[in-house]
């Protein structure tokens, strides 16, 4: 487990800023397309921006949890790099979806793939820590010795 989590914290703050920016874009779209709260329907242009932001919000807890677990229990630098790619994928997704529903696919697939990888790395790291802590078996150390 990493003693210093500064890289994970930096990616977390950056991703929080991205979420805030997406929310701001929904506010701007509400003004532009004259959709007043609490309404969430209106022009297709507004609905795409709103839906893109909502999807990002829906996936955000999964991202934060898997980012930190992969960083703490697997490798902070690798998890940080994956986190930055995830943020880029969400950027592609949001702006693609804002233009046309079909343009969201690339960003969605990229960010979903990164989430799957972060989940896998976190699970592997947690499993290794569990085995080391409770069974005195460190798979990662044994693998490092082999290579």
Curated annotation (Swiss-Prot):
Keyword Oxidoreductase: yes
Chief localisation class: endoplasmic reticulum
Keyword Ribonucleoprotein: no
SUPFAM superfamilies: MAPEG domain-like
Transmembrane segments annotated in the record for this chain: 6-26, 59-79, 111-131
Family affiliation: Belongs to the MAPEG family.
Function description: Catalyzes several different glutathione-dependent reactions. Catalyzes the glutathione-dependent reduction of lipid hydroperoxides, such as 5-HPETE. Has glutathione transferase activity, toward xenobiotic electrophiles, such as 1-chloro-2, 4-dinitrobenzene (CDNB). Also catalyzes the conjugation of leukotriene A4 with reduced glutathione to form leukotriene C4 (LTC4). Involved in oxidative DNA damage induced by ER stress and anticancer agents by activating LTC4 biosynthetic machinery in nonimmune cells.
This protein's name: Microsomal glutathione S-transferase 2
Source organism (scientific name): Homo sapiens (Human)
Protein's gene: MGST2
């Amino acid at each position: 487990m990493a003693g210093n989590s500064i890289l994970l914290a930096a990616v977390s703050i950056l991703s929080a800023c991205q979420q805030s920016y997406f929310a701001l874009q929904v506010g701007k779209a509400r003004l532009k397309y004259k959709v007043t709260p609490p309404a969430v329907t209106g022009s297709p242009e507004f609905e795409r921006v709103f839906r893109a932001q909502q999807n990002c919000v829906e996936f955000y807890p999964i991202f934060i949890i898997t980012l930190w677990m992969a960083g703490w229990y697997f490798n902070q630098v690798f998890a940080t790099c994956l986190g930055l790619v995830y943020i880029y994928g969400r950027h592609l997704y949001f702006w693609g979806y804002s233009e046309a529903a079909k343009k969201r696919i690339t960003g969605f697939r990229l960010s979903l793939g990164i989430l799957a990888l972060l989940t896998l790395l976190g699970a592997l790291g947690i499993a290794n820590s569990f085995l080391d802590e409770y069974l005195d078996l460190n798979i990662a150390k044994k693998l490092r010795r082999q290579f």
